[in-house]
Amino acid sequence: MKMVTNLEVHRREVLLGGKPFGQTGAYEKVIGTIHFAADPAHPLHRQITDIDLAPKNRDGRVEFSGDFYLLKPVDPQKGNGRLLLDVPNRGRKVAVDVFNSAPRVPDPSAPEHFGNGFLMRHGYTVAWIGWQPDVPRQDGMMALDVPRLEGVTGWVRVQRRPNERVDTMPLADRYHIPYPTIDLEDAQARLTVRERSGATPVEVPRSAWRFSDATHIALDGGFAPGAIYQVIYRSANPSLVGLGFLAVRDTATWLRWAPEASGNPCAGALERAYLFGLSQSGRFLRHMLFLGLDEDEQGRMVFDGVMPHVGGGRRGEFNLRFGQPSLNMHASVGSLPPFNDEGVFERLRKRGRIPRIIATNSTPEYWRGDASLIHTDIDGTRDAEPAEFVRTYLFAGTQHTPGALPPLAANSSTGDRGYHVFNVVDYAPLLRAALVNLDRWVSEGVEPPPSRFPRLADGTAVEAESLAPFYAAIPGTRFPQRIVRPSKLDFGPDCERGVATYPPKAGAPYKTYVSSIDADGNEIAGLRAPELEAPLATFTGWNTRDPDTGAAGDLMSMNGSTLPFPFTRADRERTGDPRLSIAERYASKAAYLERVRETTRKSIAARHLLAEDLEAVVDRADRLWDWIHQESGRAARSLS
């Protein structure tokens, strides 16, 4: 029985008029809809919450369909025979922009949309499939159509944090499709507010707030900027969100092994398949592997290699009744253990067929508290070594996404603004090298460089609060007033079967760590990009909220900071900055660029960077020097 029943092609066209990407040649895109049919009785599928309640076709299978997008070499013989399936992040494609250092666009069609062409020059076939039922089909976002469980009711919990005062808020994360309330007058619905992170929730009297319609709430006086609001209410007819795992798996299965007669545009062209996910979709990958759902209905291990990126130690509401796959709340079912490799990959070990995994994180995943749980025991008292089939890397001194130069004024996803200028370190070259290392590991048996992360044993794993004195000594710096760690949570007796009780019972916080720092305030542990090895600034993975957006002093969830060194020794002595000035480090711009070139070559030799990125790294360092000098001058004037 076929898992993919049909590819409905809407568009198929050659990219850029046939312009070649190096030796790979021209690429084409295929855009369409994939139709699926899954066996609900299959032992693996019984893990999908409520699949037994889903409507079935005459063959007893559950049908669903998702948006499909494919980039492939026109001549498959010129490709590398590798599929990279990029799990969309909240409906958006990410692989081309992060690996190719390109702008993020929904339908890459112009030369600039492919950046440096890395994935294409290396011959990858890149695919996407919509996997979220709650994604609106707007701005090219990709979604999954799944059955709804008609007549099933239950509780939903939504969290919102506005950056400005607003009169109403939707019952969904960001722009996603809400679960509507079943009763506008529901007296059991609850709204709580916390004035800042870590504060005790205060219940808002029911008379002070209301459902303005089935998908929005309103509050007397409006919702305050920076405050954290949670609403718990009843809804009906939940989507079968867990089918997203099967959509991702079966798309790759079909592309790898289905014959040309089935309409497979990649028939016979793919030898290997790799799975990539960033942030929310990185957590999706961890959850998928935890369930062992990288194995298809025929018992084949679909993915040879997996790259969960900036997913931290969490999973998500990806297999929950009334689950919100886009939810980014820390106190969610996605923050339940297990966290480290021993627990997350237990099912893979038992079956004996295991993909190679390279897990990468940036610094904010450590400062929010969950990333260190990947490589400690549950009590945070000892290091837990990664499994032999895993490499774990911290990209030291980075923020959640590659730093832009010049930096953005606000987070492009959330609109959040920081007190400090955002982190400008570009970790994309590290990510490109990680993919090459994964491919060589799978294809040639060449093991990647050893894992690099903060360790208790060597003192590089420290509590975040211990770093406050150093950062506080840097003039003009605002260190977070509160470090909030994830807590032990209890979502009730039915959580194991995918039904959560709200609010959860919260226990003691976990013991978590960040990397220690050097004399410049830059992180010691992890893979250090050239920006840290030849520094012009302190690059942190933390930033605090802009006071104009409320809750000043609260930690931002995804952005770091760039704290430029003083320009001259006189600037350093006048301001009392504990860090050496730029002029004391480098005799000239040329000397600085030579240092960048030297340290980049060392990273290439260690296989942390690729030789093809050397000149691009030096060119960016040239621009970084100019920008940092501008920022150093501005800072010196403001402190004089």
Language-model-detected regions and their locations in the chain:
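C-terminal His-loop and adjacent cap/lid subdomain of alpha/beta-hydrolase
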Residues: 2-640
